[in-house]
């Protein structure tokens, strides 16, 4: 579904003039940073809808032609930079008219909202007034202000980072896993499991994946470590899949080939289809309190929850290094596959 930014005009896209009316070309000045911010957001797959109150268009105080000349000039400015608005909604009334279309009311968008499916959790209103915040509440979407202390650069960063995070709580009779990921954050991850070696491996995934991972996991180790490792992999896959959202603009594919005395290769396709092929032989039963048979099972569980095809092969002598190489290459491949470098969905089907 669409991710929509409902954007105010005066005071948000262009500076608000002293008399609060853009009726001549010499009053038009773009707000600082608006062009690069909108280009970033457009690349991230957002649809732009302009929604603006314009007091008294068509009156003596605000002739229709004065509005039209300025409005078309503003649209041409943005269009010249590759920024397009899918729809534009203008309320021409004054507050005294008590119309149903003036923000914060939503009447202006009634038909559009009925005909358009969009993801409310990933959609925002951006504006400079309290009425824009009320408008966002009435639409059931998020809100971010534009002001001298809250710039377009900050708005773009907040939206892009927020759009790529997710939390999963997985509680069963055997385990309790509380996990969150933020794909575009390089904060130091905080990971706590009762198996130090497993914790260390997950730290490698987050570090080399370039994302923030917060994890608190516990389980029935008195039975064995199977349930804990499996459920953690499932939660991690679910969180990354959710954080990717509609996968607009991602690379989709990831592959890497790092070496020490061990060699691990991996290829990932975040296609929505689960398949895992793990090739590697471990002659030791346990490494750091973790059964080596759980290594391929971790990748299989991750593949299933993430909806990804994973091919991985590892060879070497030192089993610690072999396993660590597997988790490091997983992180590097996820970093590559989840990176947003395109302005399209990488699938001829139109969905991933």
From Swiss-Prot:
Required co-factors: Mg(2+); Zn(2+)
Major site of localization recorded for this protein: cytoplasm
Example of a GO cellular component annotation carried by this entry: cytoplasm
Taxonomy, superkingdom: Bacteria
Reaction catalysed by this enzyme: D-erythro-1-(imidazol-4-yl)glycerol 3-phosphate = 3-(imidazol-4-yl)-2-oxopropyl phosphate + H2O; L-histidinol phosphate + H2O = L-histidinol + phosphate
Matches recorded under Gene3D superfamilies: HAD superfamily/HAD-like (3.40.50.1000), Imidazole glycerol phosphate dehydratase, domain 1 (3.30.230.40)
Positions contributing to Mg(2+) binding: 8, 10, 128
Sorted UniProt keywords: Amino-acid biosynthesis, Cytoplasm, Histidine biosynthesis, Hydrolase, Lyase, Magnesium, Metal-binding, Multifunctional enzyme, Zinc
InterPro entries, alphabetized: HAD-like_sf (IPR036412), HAD-SF_hydro_IIIA (IPR006549), HAD_sf (IPR023214), His_synth_bifunc_HisB (IPR020566), HisB_N (IPR005954), Histidinol-phos (IPR006543), IGPD_sf (IPR038494), ImidazoleglycerolP_deHydtase (IPR000807)
GO molecular function: histidinol-phosphatase activity; imidazoleglycerol-phosphate dehydratase activity; metal ion binding
Active site per UniProt: 8 (nucleophile), 10 (proton donor)
Family: In the N-terminal section; belongs to the histidinol-phosphatase family. In the C-terminal section; belongs to the imidazoleglycerol-phosphate dehydratase family.
Protein name: Histidine biosynthesis bifunctional protein HisB
Originating species: Legionella pneumophila (strain Lens)
Organismal lineage: Bacteria, Pseudomonadati, Pseudomonadota, Gammaproteobacteria, Legionellales
